[in-house]
Amino acid sequence: MVVMDSPVSGRMADQNIDPNTTTSPSPIEKHVSAIKAISGDEKAPSKEKKNYASKKSTTVIQKSHCFQNSWTFWFDNPSSKSNQVIWGSSLRSLYTFATIEEFWSLYNNIHPPTKWVSGSDLYCFKDKIEPKWEDPICANGGKWTMFFPRATLESNWLNTLLALVGEQFDQGDEICGAVLNFRTRGDRISLWTKKAANEEAQLSIGKQWKELLGYNDTIGFIVHEDAKTLDRDAKRRYTV
C-alpha cells in the first residue's frame, strides 16, 4: 500500500484552506485511515462575559473547491504483476477525488516515488477511464513520455498532476491521464491521450507539457496499437 501514516501537509494553506477550523469527517478520512482530520480547537467562550445562557460552540463548514473533472489514483506493484495472468489485472483503484482539498489530502499521504519498489506504477486518470489499452476511451490513443533523473522525479510528477487537475492544457479534453513508472533503467512520466490520429491535438499537448515543466529534450508520441503489436520496436508517431 502506498499510503503512509503522516499528517496533512501545510500545503493546504496555499489552497486557501484554514487548518484551524472544525470540519466533519470527509470521505477520505473514512476510507484512508492514515489521513488525519483537519481540525482545531473550538473557540472558547470569553472569560470577560459570563453568558451561561448560551454556550454553543461554533463550527465553520469549509467550502470545497471543485475541479472541472473527477480523477482517480491507481497503483500497480511488481509483486502483483509477477502473478498476473492478464496484463492490467493487478491494477488497484485507490481513490477518486473531485476537489482541491481531497487532492492534497491524498497526495500528501502517498509515499514519494523515491520510496517505492522498482517496477511500481502510479496513475492519475479521469474518473471512469481505466489506465489500460483496452479501455474504450484509451484504445485509439497513445502517449507522450518524458524521462527524469530520480532527484527531479517527484517535483515533475507533482507539476504534471497540477497541470492536469488544474486544466492547464488547451486540449485538455483529449487527455486521459498521467502515469509515473518507477524503473531501475530509467524513471518516466507519460501522458495518455484519446485519439492518436488527431495530430493537431497531440502536438499541442506535447508542446504545452514541455513548456509547463521546462523540459528541453525531444519527446515522442507512441500509438497504443503500435506498442501492443511491436512492443519496444514501436516507432514514434510524432515528436516535439
Swiss-Prot record:
Disulfide pairings: 138-176
Any one GO molecular-function label of the UniProt entry: translation initiation factor activity
Keywords: Cytoplasm, Disulfide bond, Initiation factor, Nucleus, Protein biosynthesis, RNA-binding, Translation regulation
Pfam family, one: IF4E
Post-translational modification: According to the redox status, the Cys-138-Cys-176 disulfide bridge may have a role in regulating protein function by affecting its ability to bind capped mRNA.
Gene3D superfamilies, A to Z: RNA Cap, Translation Initiation Factor Eif4e (3.30.760.10)
Keyword Nucleus: yes
Biased composition regions of type Polar residues, renumbered to the chain: 17-26
Cellular location(s): Nucleus; Cytoplasm
Region of interest (Disordered), ranges: 1-29
Top-level division of the source organism's lineage: Eukaryota
Coiled-coil residues: none
Cellular component aspect of the GO annotation: cytoplasm; nucleus
Amino acids binding mRNA: 83-88, 115, 133-134, 183-188, 228-232
Chief location bin: nucleus
EIF4G-binding, as annotated region: 65-68, 75-111, 159-168
GO biological process, one term: regulation of translation
Assembly behavior: EIF4F is a multi-subunit complex, the composition of which varies with external and internal environmental conditions. It is composed of at least EIF4A, EIF4E and EIF4G. EIF4E is also known to interact with other partners. In higher plants two isoforms of EIF4F have been identified, named isoform EIF4F and isoform EIF(iso)4F. Isoform EIF4F has subunits p220 and p26, whereas isoform EIF(iso)4F has subunits p82 and p28.
Family stated for the protein in its record: Belongs to the eukaryotic initiation factor 4E family.
Function statement: Component of the protein complex eIF4F, which is involved in the recognition of the mRNA cap, ATP-dependent unwinding of 5'-terminal secondary structure and recruitment of mRNA to the ribosome. Recognizes and binds the 7-methylguanosine-containing mRNA cap during an early step in the initiation of protein synthesis and facilitates ribosome binding by inducing the unwinding of the mRNAs secondary structures.
UniProt-recorded name of the protein: Eukaryotic translation initiation factor 4E-2
